[in-house]
């Protein structure tokens, strides 16, 4: 029993593991181009079922601890393999043996405590290799990279354990586009370790201390074009002459990111510049300066050796005692030939006038995200300041008056571009003064509600994005580019305001439509961005977009950013795909069609009414309604006649001379109702007919050819027809005065025709011997 129980649990475990593996295999998704994504799928091993069709495989963020020699054998055409953060601690020596086409390999942030050169031997096509973030101390016993002749990007090292860089580490590498070394725990650097790489375009060094900086600098001086130092504490850096002969260093850019400096160490760093004669750009990002700016270069030749530095960039510089900071007079001469300076988000509130006057070559100055106000700006832009300045960026400072700002900058005679965006200005005045050469003005995110003539007429580029504008009516004759996105405009501005406009960006406004005429009114417009507006997909707009395939040449964000906001049935549809309904877009044609159809219907109904005696049925309905208002059966006291005689005027001789004489002079006599004698004068004929029939016990119809042609006889027959069949009253007596064709009786009297087929009627005999019998039968019928 116990054995069976163990066997059961083993089978359950195998089933669970197999189902998990199958589920994992199913979650590996590949597209038609061979790019497979297996990120964060809880794989515990390389998935099976890999094929030669795969070009890219990403298995990052899994739990793969081991890569065996056969796991990737099927991926002969694989070009990209990403195994980042997958807990890998063991890789077989020939695991990558079949990956001769591999160009990109990422093994970063795993648990590889040692590296093997056998992994990389077959990877002759490899261009990118990332080994960063693994807990190894060195790069292995032998050189890892002698066969990687095509390698362009290499990332190595870690934060805590990588402690030694040796000569053999980079043997075989002669040229790299990018080399990144994270060695924050570096304890030993073997001289000339990096010297074997003759050409490095961009070298990034993560060093916590500056102990080995001079040795490394000496090795890379002749090979690196862009050196980036990260997270380095340079507070204790001391310069000493480098053990190198005169060399022409190709280094163009030097960057410090996250570094710590002091006034003294800054002076020491300046001494390095004598070895970098071609240096043109220096950058400080997220650095800390523990000092007061008391820079005092001790060697006079430093000044001359800074001659080719044209760009200085400082971002987010933290100076704990910035309010005590010096005026930098000691470095004025160092920056005389600099053309571009950026000091961003560094609590700058003043550039001393004398410093500004020394920046004679400065063409570009960016003081974004600082503390500048008009009073201090006036001191900075004093007479003679920045004489060559063409572009000034004062974005996100504390400027308030547009008028004062313009007047202060009048001293900058060569200023052509001004960015004062993200300042909170007071309402725009009607007039302002600006430098006469100004061509570009950025007023985005300044909260302006109205654009006035304060804006200079000389502008070629104007940016008023992200404000509260609901209209734009300023004439700018030279304007070529207008950026007015994220406002409240409901339509495109009038084209006559910008006769030479080339580019307009009006995204995220309240524009509901635009037309062919509107776009055509801009004679030189080449680019329009009007997406993400509240478009009303009217017939005119949709018709225009469907009939103008060249829109994609002008609308750079067409078609994905152009969506219908209304009507509701088209909400969210692209203008390109939306189709208007016939009811909305062809109302005139639709109304015309409906009217024509209605007219045809009326004609058809009229023809049918004529053919099927519709008017007669209407008259019959009227008579029926009239009769319904009266009691269904007249009281006995209202029945005044034994019979109402309905006859044609042409048959009056027979009725008056024969029928009346025979019936009214009989014993007992019958009282007959004749229209000539008994109708009430002045009363409507139809009312007389109805009343006479209702007051008569019977109705005698004297049928003849004349009868069926008589109009009034038809009315009498109509109402009798109603009385006969609506009241189930057998009150009609048919007297056939002369033989008539049955088809002469109108089709509408279908029941009357049926009676003539099913019931006996009296026929006037021409034989005088039979006429007495006829009268006897008629009297009997009236009495019944």
UniProtKB/Swiss-Prot annotation:
<dbReference type="GO" id="GO:0042495">
    <property type="term" value="P:detection of triacyl bacterial lipopeptide"/>
</dbReference>
<dbReference type="GO" id="GO:0071224">
    <property type="term" value="P:cellular response to peptidoglycan"/>
</dbReference>
<keyword id="KW-0472">Membrane</keyword>
<dbReference type="GO" id="GO:0045121">
    <property type="term" value="C:membrane raft"/>
</dbReference>
<dbReference type="GO" id="GO:0002730">
    <property type="term" value="P:regulation of dendritic cell cytokine production"/>
</dbReference>
<keyword id="KW-0395">Inflammatory response</keyword>
<feature type="domain" description="LRRCT">
    <location>
        <begin position="525"/>
        <end position="576"/>
    </location>
</feature>
<feature type="repeat" description="LRR 14">
    <location>
        <begin position="389"/>
        <end position="414"/>
    </location>
</feature>
<dbReference type="GO" id="GO:0005794">
    <property type="term" value="C:Golgi apparatus"/>
</dbReference>
<dbReference type="GO" id="GO:0035354">
    <property type="term" value="C:Toll-like receptor 1-Toll-like receptor 2 protein complex"/>
</dbReference>
<keyword id="KW-0832">Ubl conjugation</keyword>
<keyword id="KW-0732">Signal</keyword>
<feature type="repeat" description="LRR 11">
    <location>
        <begin position="309"/>
        <end position="337"/>
    </location>
</feature>
<dbReference type="GO" id="GO:0002752">
    <property type="term" value="P:cell surface pattern recognition receptor signaling pathway"/>
</dbReference>
<feature type="repeat" description="LRR 1">
    <location>
        <begin position="54"/>
        <end position="77"/>
    </location>
</feature>
<dbReference type="GO" id="GO:0050729">
    <property type="term" value="P:positive regulation of inflammatory response"/>
</dbReference>
<dbReference type="GO" id="GO:1904417">
    <property type="term" value="P:positive regulation of xenophagy"/>
</dbReference>
<dbReference type="GO" id="GO:0038187">
    <property type="term" value="F:pattern recognition receptor activity"/>
</dbReference>
<dbReference type="GO" id="GO:0070371">
    <property type="term" value="P:ERK1 and ERK2 cascade"/>
</dbReference>
<dbReference type="GO" id="GO:1902533">
    <property type="term" value="P:positive regulation of intracellular signal transduction"/>
</dbReference>
<dbReference type="GO" id="GO:0001540">
    <property type="term" value="F:amyloid-beta binding"/>
</dbReference>
<dbReference type="GO" id="GO:0042497">
    <property type="term" value="F:triacyl lipopeptide binding"/>
</dbReference>
<dbReference type="GO" id="GO:0032728">
    <property type="term" value="P:positive regulation of interferon-beta production"/>
</dbReference>
<feature type="repeat" description="LRR 13">
    <location>
        <begin position="362"/>
        <end position="388"/>
    </location>
</feature>
<keyword id="KW-1133">Transmembrane helix</keyword>
<protein>
    <recommendedName>
        <fullName>Toll-like receptor 2</fullName>
    </recommendedName>
</protein>
<dbReference type="InterPro" id="IPR001611">
    <property type="entry name" value="Leu-rich_rpt"/>
</dbReference>
<keyword id="KW-0391">Immunity</keyword>
<feature type="repeat" description="LRR 2">
    <location>
        <begin position="78"/>
        <end position="101"/>
    </location>
</feature>
<dbReference type="GO" id="GO:0002687">
    <property type="term" value="P:positive regulation of leukocyte migration"/>
</dbReference>
<dbReference type="InterPro" id="IPR003591">
    <property type="entry name" value="Leu-rich_rpt_typical-subtyp"/>
</dbReference>
<dbReference type="GO" id="GO:0070374">
    <property type="term" value="P:positive regulation of ERK1 and ERK2 cascade"/>
</dbReference>
<feature type="repeat" description="LRR 16">
    <location>
        <begin position="438"/>
        <end position="457"/>
    </location>
</feature>
<dbReference type="GO" id="GO:0032741">
    <property type="term" value="P:positive regulation of interleukin-18 production"/>
</dbReference>
<dbReference type="GO" id="GO:0071726">
    <property type="term" value="P:cellular response to diacyl bacterial lipopeptide"/>
</dbReference>
<feature type="repeat" description="LRR 17">
    <location>
        <begin position="458"/>
        <end position="478"/>
    </location>
</feature>
<feature type="short sequence motif" description="ATG16L1-binding motif">
    <location>
        <begin position="761"/>
        <end position="778"/>
    </location>
</feature>
<dbReference type="GO" id="GO:0006954">
    <property type="term" value="P:inflammatory response"/>
</dbReference>
<dbReference type="GO" id="GO:0006952">
    <property type="term" value="P:defense response"/>
</dbReference>
<dbReference type="GO" id="GO:0032755">
    <property type="term" value="P:positive regulation of interleukin-6 production"/>
</dbReference>
<dbReference type="InterPro" id="IPR000483">
    <property type="entry name" value="Cys-rich_flank_reg_C"/>
</dbReference>
<dbReference type="GO" id="GO:0032735">
    <property type="term" value="P:positive regulation of interleukin-12 production"/>
</dbReference>
């Amino acid at each position: 029993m116990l054995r069976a129980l163990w066997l059961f649990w083993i089978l359950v475990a195998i089933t669970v593991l197999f189902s998990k593996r199958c589920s994992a295999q199913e979650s590996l998704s590949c597209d038609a181009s061979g790019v497979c994504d297996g990120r964060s799928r809880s794989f515990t091993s390389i998935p099976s079922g890999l094929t030669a069709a795969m070009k890219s495989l990403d298995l990052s963020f899994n739990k793969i601890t081991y890569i065996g020699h056969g796991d990737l054998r099927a991926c002969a055409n694989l070009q990209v393999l990403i195994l980042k953060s997958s807990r890998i601690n063991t890789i077989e020596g020939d695991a990558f043996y079949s990956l001769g086409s591999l160009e990109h390999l990422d093994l970063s942030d795993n648990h590889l405590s040692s590296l093997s050169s056998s992994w990389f031997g077959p990877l002759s096509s490899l261009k990118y290799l990332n080994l960063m973030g693994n807990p190894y101390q060195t790069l292995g016993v032998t050189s890892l990279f002698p066969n990687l002749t095509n390698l362009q990007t290499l990332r190595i090292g870690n934060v805590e354990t990588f402690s030694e860089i040796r000569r053999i580490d980079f043997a075989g590498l002669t040229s790299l586009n990018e080399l990144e070394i994270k060695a924050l725990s570096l304890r030993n650097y073997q001289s000339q370790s990096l010297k074997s790489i003759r050409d490095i375009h961009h070298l990034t060094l993560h060093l916590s201390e500056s102990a080995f900086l001079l040795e490394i600098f000496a090795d890379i001086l002749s090979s690196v074009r862009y050196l980036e130092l990260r997270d380095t504490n340079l507070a204790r850096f001391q310069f000493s002459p480098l053990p190198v002969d005169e060399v022409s260093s190709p280094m163009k850019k030097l960057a410090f990111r996250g570094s710590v400096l002091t006034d003294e160490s800054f002076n020491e760093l300046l001494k390095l510049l004598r070895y970098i004669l071609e240096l043109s750009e220096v950058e400080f990002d997220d650095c800390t300066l523990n000092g007061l700016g008391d820079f005092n270069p001790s060697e006079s030749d430093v000044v001359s050796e800074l001659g080719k530095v044209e760009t200085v960039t400082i971002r987010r510089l933290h100076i704990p005692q910035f309010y005590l900071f010096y005026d930098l007079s000691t470095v004025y001469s160092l920056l005389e030939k600099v053309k571009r300076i950026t000091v961003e988000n560094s609590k700058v509130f003043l550039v001393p006038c004398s410093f500004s006057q020394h920046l004679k070559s400065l063409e570009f100055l960016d003081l974004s995200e600082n503390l500048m106000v008009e009073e201090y700006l006036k001191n900075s832009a004093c007479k003679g300041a920045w004489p060559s300045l063409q572009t000034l960026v004062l974005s996100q400072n504390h400027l308030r008056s547009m008028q004062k700002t313009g007047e202060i900058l009048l001293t900058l005679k060569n200023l052509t571009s001004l960015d004062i965006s993200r300042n909170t200005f007071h309402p725009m005045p009607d007039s302002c003064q600006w430098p006469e050469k100004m061509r570009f003005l950025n007023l985005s995110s300044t909260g302006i509600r109205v654009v006035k003539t304060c804006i200079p007429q000389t502008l070629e580029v104007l940016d008023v994005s992200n404000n509260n504008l609901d209209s734009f009516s300023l004439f700018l004759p030279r304007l070529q580019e207008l950026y007015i996105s994220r406002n409240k405009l409901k339509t495109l501005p009038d084209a006559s305001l910008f006769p030479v406009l080339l580019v307009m960006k009006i995204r995220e406004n309240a524009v509901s439509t635009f037309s062919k005429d509107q776009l055509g009114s801009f004679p030189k417009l080449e680019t329009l961005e009007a997406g993400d507006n509240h478009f009303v997909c009217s017939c005119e707009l949709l018709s225009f977009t469907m009939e103008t395939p060249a829109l994609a040449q002008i609308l750079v964000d067409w078609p994905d950013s152009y969506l219908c906001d209304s009507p509701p049935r088209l909400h969210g549809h692209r203008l390109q795909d939306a189709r208007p309904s016939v009811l909305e877009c062809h109302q005139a044609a639709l109304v015309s069609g409906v009217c024509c159809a209605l007219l045809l219907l009326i004609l058809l109904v009229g023809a049918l009414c004529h053919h099927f005696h519709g008017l007669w049925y209407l008259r019959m309905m009227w008579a029926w309604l009239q009769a319904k208002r009266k009691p269904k059966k007249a009281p006995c006291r209202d029945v005044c006649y034994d019979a109402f005689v309905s006859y044609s005027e042409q048959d009056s001789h027979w009725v008056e001379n024969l029928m009346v004489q025979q019936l009214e002079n009989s014993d007992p006599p019958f009282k007959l109702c004749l229209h000539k004698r008994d109708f009430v004068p002045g009363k409507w004929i139809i009312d007389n007919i109805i009343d006479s029939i209702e007051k008569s016990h019977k109705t005698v119809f004297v049928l003849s050819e004349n009868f069926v042609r008589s109009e009034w006889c038809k009315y009498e027959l109509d109402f009798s027809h109603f009385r006969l069949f609506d009241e189930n009253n057998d009150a009609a007596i048919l007297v056939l005065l002369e033989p008539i064709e049955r088809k002469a009786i109108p089709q509408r009297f279908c029941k009357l025709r049926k009676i003539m087929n099913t019931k006996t009627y009296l026929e006037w005999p021409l034989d005088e011997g039979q006429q007495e019998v006829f009268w006897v039968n008629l009297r009997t019928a009236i009495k019944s």
